[in-house]
Amino acid sequence: KNAKPVLHLHATGQYGVQLFKDLEKEKGFAPGDSLVVKEYINNMPELLAAADLVISRAGALTLAELEAVGRAAVLIPSPNVAENHQYYNAMELQKAGAAVVIEEKDLTGEKLVQTVSEMLAQPGKLAEMGKNARSLSVDDSLDRIADALLKLVKTP
């Protein structure tokens, strides 16, 4: 519950849909105007661009999308990945002032709500974090890859 209206869009994946149905029964809430639950999101770039704040895992492609659209984030790296790479990905954004990282072992509902509420209460800081995220984006990656491939082809 927030003083300002918040729309929470939650992508569950295949197995999370039932979890939300179970929570609805257990906790007495239902998705409505402020909570939209989807199994899969087809228009992620559009929704990321419209978001004020993104709560997400910290896979490399997800972070590249956040950087491309310049969005502040709360990142919860998955501990169940090779060499804990999501943690290191997330920490780079936090060091750059583009994200707040909460490790899963430290995550509680209360901590997440407090973190999100504090961030949403500071629109100027959110905007700054978004600019910091955008500054990390590599916009010429296609050109870089093409140049590298051309050098390989031209090398005898």
Predicted regions and their residues:
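C-terminal alpha-helical cap of glycosyltransferases
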Residues: 138-156
